[in-house]
């Protein structure tokens, strides 16, 4: 079967309905992963179909993903998004990508030169929490991170996203060019502030004058992104190939729902993403807190406790009334009360929509995938609501059970005695603690004492220790399904 390209798509109605030859690489995106393909690049594609804009995207993978970039090049930088509803699938061919680079396929210098080109107005990122080289508990730069150490020692040959951004801004400053906006699109609370803090701290260690120039001239808008995008599987790619009549190794499937809330703070212009459904606002924080706590927090709850309960996919957990009810109750009783939202926000309606999205059987979103990088996610998704309930003296049993589920998961052994492939930047540290205690409740205060995940105000709080210990003991004695059903 042929691969997707301009020539193989000429007989299809799915071609982008705008002139791709007029596009310029005005956006450089770091991290051509599944989420970006189904979200920001798709928003840009739909914006282009509704305007006469020339905002194209240069895609860059810094770590791995060489094959993806090579495939993208062979198919004229076209790829497919399959929006899978419960009963039907809509396939869209995305044409907003103009070119692509990879330091191991091209060169570090080629990447830096692209970022330094005068027409580049935005450098956006989906590099995950760990890509910011930040301490998850404080949000400040982790100066002991090997990538940070390497980039400070050899700044003209960067490895990290921070290193590339700071070096590219240095080049632009030296050439008298305007800077670009740095736009984080990662699922991290106040992602723009975290990106700014990390960039400024890194630049301070490298060149204090450059740091001051960046602070004065560069903007770091916060964004809230939402769309469930499972990792691509062979089944996904086969389905896309059957629908298209040609293969697309860059294809991705996702749910129909999408949301993008953007702080309107750009130093060198921006696309009119609002015509594609994005919202430009003055303050993103309430929206991202709503999403991180209600959606992502319950997603983590379902991931750890669902995996332990033998459920492979989030939609599988929704067939269990105990999990379905516990997820909704967690949203409404543990997370929603901790939020301060603009007037008129319907949190109950939002929670019901989330349950509907989680139930979509077409997505096959693996609990194991969502369970990755828990040490980075838990502070963002549960820390704020935990503080709220401690201050209010209210019930936080759902949060305690979610944290206990994570602790049981990172032990590396499931309820049948099989190994769990724990993927986490702190996996080795966590495994060592778990190995010292075995499946014993004594592990709880030890894991809560890891301040990179749990600040002392939470990890050493007797109420937190007691509640998490109680939930952990229930997981050992009764298993995940019974523990969830009892909530």
Where are the model-predicted features located?
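Substrate/ligand-engaging "lid" and interaction regions
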Residues: 1-487
């Amino acid at each position: 079967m042929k691969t997707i390209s301009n020539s193989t798509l000429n007989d299809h109605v799915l071609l982008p309905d705008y002139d791709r030859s007029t596009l310029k690489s005005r956006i450089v995106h770091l991290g051509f992963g599944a989420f970006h393909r189904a979200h920001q690049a798709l928003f840009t594609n739909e914006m282009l179909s509704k305007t006469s804009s020339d905002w194209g995207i240069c895609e860059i993978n810094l770590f791995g993903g060489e094959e993806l970039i090579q495939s993208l090049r062979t198919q004229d930088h076209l790829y497919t998004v399959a929006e899978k509803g419960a009963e039907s699938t809509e396939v869209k061919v995305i044409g907003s990508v103009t070119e692509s680079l990879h330091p191991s396929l091209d060169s570090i210098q080629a990447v830096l030169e692209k970022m330094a080109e005068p027409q580049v107005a935005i450098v956006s990122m989906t590099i995950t929490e760990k890509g910011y080289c930040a301490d998850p508990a404080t949000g400040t730069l982790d100066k002991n991170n090997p990538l940070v150490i390497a980039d400070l020692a050899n700044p003209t040959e960067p490895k990290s996203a921070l290193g590339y951004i700071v070096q590219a801004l240095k080049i632009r400053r030296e050439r008298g060019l305007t800077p670009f906006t740095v736009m984080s699109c990662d699922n991290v609370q106040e992602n723009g502030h975290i990106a700014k803090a990390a960039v400024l701290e890194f630049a301070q260690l490298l060149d204090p004058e450059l740091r001051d120039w960046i602070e004065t001239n560069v903007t770091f808008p916060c964004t809230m992104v939402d769309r469930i995008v499972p990792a691509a599987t062979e089944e996904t790619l086969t389905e896309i190939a059957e629908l298209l009549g040609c293969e697309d190794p860059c294809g991705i499937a996702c749910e129909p729902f999408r949301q993008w809330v953007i702080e309107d703070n750009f130093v060198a212009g921006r696309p009119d993403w609002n015509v594609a459904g994005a919202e430009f606002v003055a303050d993103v924080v309430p929206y991202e807190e709503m999403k991180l706590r209600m959606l992502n927090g319950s997603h983590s709850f379902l991931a750890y406790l669902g995996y332990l309960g033998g459920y492979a996919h989030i939609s599988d957990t929704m067939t269990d009334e105990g999990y379905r009810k516990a997820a909704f109750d967690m949203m409404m009783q543990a997370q929603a009360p901790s939020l301060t939202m603009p007037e008129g926000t319907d949190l109950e309606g939002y929670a019901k929509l989330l349950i509907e999205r989680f139930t979509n059987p077409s997505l096959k979103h693996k609990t194991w995938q969502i369970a990755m990088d828990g040490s980075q996610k838990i502070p963002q998704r549960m820390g704020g609501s935990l503080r709220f309930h401690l201050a209010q003296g209210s019930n936080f049993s759902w949060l305690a059970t979610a944290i206990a589920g994570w602790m049981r998961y990172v032990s590396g052994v499931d309820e049948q005695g099989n190994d769990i492939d724990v993927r986490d930047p702190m996996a080795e540290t966590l495994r060592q603690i778990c190995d010292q205690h075995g499946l014993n409740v004594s592990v709880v205060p030890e894991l809560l004492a890891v301040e990179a995940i749990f600040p002392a105000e939470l990890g050493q709080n007797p109420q937190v220790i007691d509640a998490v210990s109680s939930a952990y003991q229930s997981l050992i004695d009764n298993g995940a399904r019974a523990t969830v059903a009892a909530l």
